[in-house]
A protein has these predicted regions:
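Acceptor-binding helix/loop patch of EC 2.4 sugar-transfer enzymes
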Residues: 39, 105-151, 219, 294, ...
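A charged, aromatic-enriched C-terminal amphipathic alpha-helix characteristic of glycosyltransferases
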Residues: 328-362
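Conserved donor-binding/catalytic core segment of Leloir-type glycosyltransferases
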Residues: 188-224, 230
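Short hydrophobic beta-strand element within catalytic cores of glycosyltransferases
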Residues: 288-297
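Membrane-proximal helix-turn-helix segments that form the acceptor-binding/catalytic region
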Residues: 62-70, 91-102, 128-167
């Protein structure tokens, strides 16, 4: 079979495409490298600055279009598949839908139905837009709620893509739950794929101070809650300077991020929403992930035995106590590291995820004879 992925986030589609190729299929990923993050794509199409950059970007896509026909599945990264205004995105989407067998819209990040599920349906105890019954009113939450719920062209494209895609895919618990809430008949869950390297050497007993790593994207500080996490980590480091080492990476390319994280004991990832690629990268390296890991996320994976992540509550004192426990008891990290590696291999191995993705074809053929 032939698969085309348009747009990516954190190498998720690129890793899935690798798995599909190893299973004997054709797969192509087109997108951007993500500014300073420098992600992997097969064909890089990035928009340059100014009017000239916009024209060149449009021409590149127009030249590519004739080559993007005849695929079994075209998978769009929500509305982030191209850097155009909604009206032009719709034209490209409709063209690709017409000239390929099936189209899937995958939610890998923010989108109309995700924001709608958080703000209007209030599906979650905490999210990018609420903590319990209290709305988050920071600049990011307010701006994103307005953009995804109140901008007519954005809403119109979101509805069009959701209604005309043959399937909708959520890659994390919240994304799946929001899509399923509004489109239960056509929503599927496919886990994030992860390559699992050979078992690392640092999964034995922690020697010396506990090494805690945090990666920060400055422009997404409030969204991810890393402003709060960094504040808690500084306090913890001040209280236990001899028992922990704190490492911070800010706006670094993907490969450098992985190098800086290697050898850490704990990754402190994010608040408000469930674990994603950063946590999986860490776990595959034998690093314990401190993130959001609610029971519903494990249940969606049918996981009933292994719960290796440190589940962070959305309050500073709770975060402090969770992390303090491991700073004071580093001997408990070794088993959590082993469980982390096993969890990723069992639930997120890229070849297994590729097989799950391929199984969507049966549902597509059944629903669209």
């Amino acid at each position: 079979m032939k698969f085309l992925f348009i747009g990516d986030a954190s190498n998720a589609r690129y890793t899935l495409a690798k798995g599909l190729r190893e299973l004997g299929h054709e797969a192509l990923v087109i997108g951007t490298r993500g500014k300073w993050r420098r992600m992997n794509v097969d064909i890089c199409v990035e928009r340059g600055a100014g009017r000239v950059g916009a024209v060149v970007y449009l021409l590149r896509w127009l030249l590519l279009l004739p080559k993007l026909r005849g695929y079994d599945i075209v998978d769009f990264n929500g509305q982030f598949f191209m850097d155009f205004k909604p009206g032009l995105k719709r034209l490209f989407f409709d063209y690709l839908r017409k000239h390929n067998r099936y189209v899937i819209s995958t939610l890998l990040g923010l989108g109309h139905y995700y924001v709608k599920g958080c703000v209007e349906a209030k599906l979650f105890r905490s999210s990018d837009f609420n903590i319990g019954d209290t709305p988050r009113t920071n600049a990011f939450a307010s701006q994103m709620a307005d953009e995804w719920l109140n901008q007519p062209e954005v809403v119109k494209l979101s509805r069009h893509m959701a209604e005309t895609s043959h399937l909708l895919v959520g890659t994390g618990y919240e994304y799946w739950a929001c899509l399923h809430h509004y489109f239960p008949e056509k929503t599927c869950f496919v886990p994030l794929p992860m390559e699992t390297p050979e078992e690392p050497a640092n999964i034995g007993e922690t020697q010396g101070p506990v090494r805690i790593f945090i990666g920060i994207q400055k422009e997404r500080d409030e969204e991810k809650g890393t402003d709060i996490l960094w504040r808690v980590l500084q306090r913890l480091n001040n209280d236990y300077p001899d028992k922990m080492t704190l490492v911070r990476a800010e706006n670094v390319p993907y490969d450098e991020y992985c190098r800086m994280m290697a050898g850490s004991d704990i990754l402190v990832d994010q608040l408000y929403t469930c674990y994603a690629m950063n946590a999986l990268i860490a776990m595959s390296m034998g690093i314990v992930a401190a993130t959001v890991a609610i029971p519903e996320a494990y249940a969606l994976l049918s996981e009933k035995e292994s719960f290796p992540m440190i589940d962070l509550p959305p309050d500073e004192e709770g975060i402090y106590r969770q992390l303090e426990h491991y700073v004071l008891h580093p001997e408990r990290l070794a088993e959590a590291k082993r469980q982390s590696i096993a969890f990723v291999r069992k639930r997120h191995h890229y070849l297994e995820v590729a097989r799950q993705y391929m199984s969507l074809m049966g549902r597509l053929e059944k629903n669209n004879p």
